[in-house]
């Protein structure tokens, strides 16, 4: 089994750019950024429970890793960068912490490397369970209206929230709930040590108005890039700055 994907072919000799979206997003989330790199072959994935992969279910990150590897193999992708936002960033970090032939580098935007104590894990497990119940039960527009009131989205204005609620409400609540719990931060390993021991470039992007993830970035063994005029979803808030940042990374 493989994940649903869209492909843009580039020129021979360039590594692939493999894009992973955030929770409730889909393969189109990174398209504006990816379109700025026409020479590079690009793979845009739908994660389990999302978009064209909505009917694919996993139990944990190991299941996501298996699907991601099978998908890369199905396209004969042997030389690539992983680029992920939020949930997609966590998927990318988890995947990259196992030996991966052909992985050229890791670029994460606003992805959490993992909780560090049992109390925080239990609190997150309860929180994710409550959200999952709402995604299964309530109208999605109502759930996302509350979802985007969470502190991590504090930089959004009313119009931005309204736009995101409309966009995300196209999803399937039951499959989102399943993926939310399967990839809960409560069940994710703390990846700081394996990321520090890595043998590939690791770049971490976060919006200047994203206080939570700027603090997380300071404690990561990564090259950190602050995206100006942006909050948690930096590539949506300021795509031009993210494109410029990626261009600099990929040229180095």
From Swiss-Prot:
Gene name tied to this protein: menH
Homology family: Belongs to the AB hydrolase superfamily. MenH family.
To which species is this protein native?
A: Klebsiella pneumoniae (strain 342)
Catalytic activity annotated for this protein?
A: 5-enolpyruvoyl-6-hydroxy-2-succinyl-cyclohex-3-ene-1-carboxylate = (1R,6R)-6-hydroxy-2-succinyl-cyclohexa-2,4-diene-1-carboxylate + pyruvate
Q: Name one GO molecular function term.
A: 2-succinyl-6-hydroxy-2,4-cyclohexadiene-1-carboxylate synthase activity
Give the top-level enzyme category: lyase
Q: What role is this protein assigned?
A: Catalyzes a proton abstraction reaction that results in 2,5-elimination of pyruvate from 2-succinyl-5-enolpyruvyl-6-hydroxy-3-cyclohexene-1-carboxylate (SEPHCHC) and the formation of 2-succinyl-6-hydroxy-2,4-cyclohexadiene-1-carboxylate (SHCHC).
Extract the Gene3D superfamilies matched here: alpha/beta hydrolase
Q: Give the UniProt keywords, A-Z.
A: Lyase, Menaquinone biosynthesis
The cross-references to Pfam families, in alphabetical order and at most eight, read: Abhydrolase_6 (PF12697)
Q: How does it assemble?
A: Monomer.
Tell me the Gene Ontology biological-process terms attached to this UniProt entry.
menaquinone biosynthetic process
EC number assigned by the record: 4.2.99.20
Its protein name is: 2-succinyl-6-hydroxy-2,4-cyclohexadiene-1-carboxylate synthase
Q: What is the lineage of its organism?
A: Bacteria, Pseudomonadati, Pseudomonadota, Gammaproteobacteria, Enterobacterales
Name the pathway it acts in.
Quinol/quinone metabolism; 1,4-dihydroxy-2-naphthoate biosynthesis; 1,4-dihydroxy-2-naphthoate from chorismate: step 3/7; Quinol/quinone metabolism; menaquinone biosynthesis
